[in-house]
């Protein structure tokens, strides 16, 4: 186990649909003490293996001067039952602010396992190992996993306090608050730790968000415990007081504008006859949010409208030649048809009229045979929609002998066209229609600057762009459009609001079944739909039943 493991950005990997999400909570015991005058200031780095290399995923906060830290930072991960997801936890004595770099930090030990092992055990404790597999003394790390797939809510809380006890001789207390959930076995699980407010007996702590699952295991009557401490830089925090409540009590008290609790120190209460409290803790704000799922929106009546855009540039080869990517063989569908049918048959189940807009680009089209980068392949500019995916297939096959393959490979016009439809939908202020643009192309786009600009604008709209690269061209430059490796920016430097592009080289999936192909190509769409409507704060139109006829009869 090495503390200086090489970390690289994982290349774009097409994920499979995830079975569930899990939260990981960490704590350590008996850490090595690397500081000569004080105790270690530990933090934990989480890494995940991707294609044989370790990718740094996240890092906990630093717990000052502690050899037995309990971290409040929660790692949320997608759990794939069918994959071996290798994880590495590395513990460091942190010098300076907790960032992504561990270069100047002292390695205290690490542990490798799989996410499946953690999930299966729910609570896993392992020894920490130094380099070459040596034990790091008696150091251990404990990882607790919780499934949050069924939870669709979170709460925003804001606490403040008044007239806290002064624990410092020459200044006022430096208070912070810890919120714990009481488990069924009586143990206490740290939910959140606030920041420290320096030199203040009437602190106002920053608001924070926490899932209902984390807060109370989605049981509103589960006991919660709040403790207030006076911060000590050496880790010997002074206890000010605590109180016990429930989330149900919090909500009721907040609604009645009586959300405050005596902060009580039990030792003082026993010793002092007139003791009342060590201050008062006030719940200044409580906001309960529901996080809607992809199926919430679909079952609420949101339609998925699919537009197909096909590359008719000359680099595909003469369709009359059997080597052409556009060659029609009645016994062996070409790559365009395979990708088109696999994706289209899934998408049409989410659109009540099952009509697809079918467009082409990069060809000379009749009657004047001028180059067009946005034409209806049914040659009806007034209505470019086809009946079902089979209608698109027929229009494609009928179109081939009527056009002259030409170029260049410009896709920005079609992205902008679909974006205009999505913009009209956005103005309705409802979660009623989401647009998917499926672009099938045999090469790198030639209008990259315009395409980046169009995608950045489209990232603000209810739409996603899926690009399938057919053939054996070098598609390396296309990865820039997929935001997995960083934030896509327009030529002017404007960042995309969200990642809406999924690029898939067909050759990596050509031996996959149509169902597997569709799952890979559409893997990111549910997340993108939820991200858009969540950002706009738009709930599903109807949670009680569907307003349209479409339904998830074949969920991707």
Curated annotation (Swiss-Prot):
The gene is Cpne7. This is Copine-7. One of its GO terms (biological process) is cellular response to calcium ion. Residues 1-128, 135-262 form the C2 domain. It comes from Rattus norvegicus. Residues 305-504 form the VWFA domain. One of its GO terms (molecular function) is metal ion binding. Belongs to the copine family. Changing residue 168 to N: Inhibits strongly calcium-dependent translocation to the cell membrane. Inhibits strongly calcium-dependent translocation to the cell membrane. Leads to the constitutive (calcium-independent) attachment to the cell membrane. Changing residue 35 to N: Does not inhibit calcium-dependent translocation to the cell membrane. Residues 536-556 are annotated as: Disordered. Ca(2+) 1 binds at residues 168, 174, 230, 232.
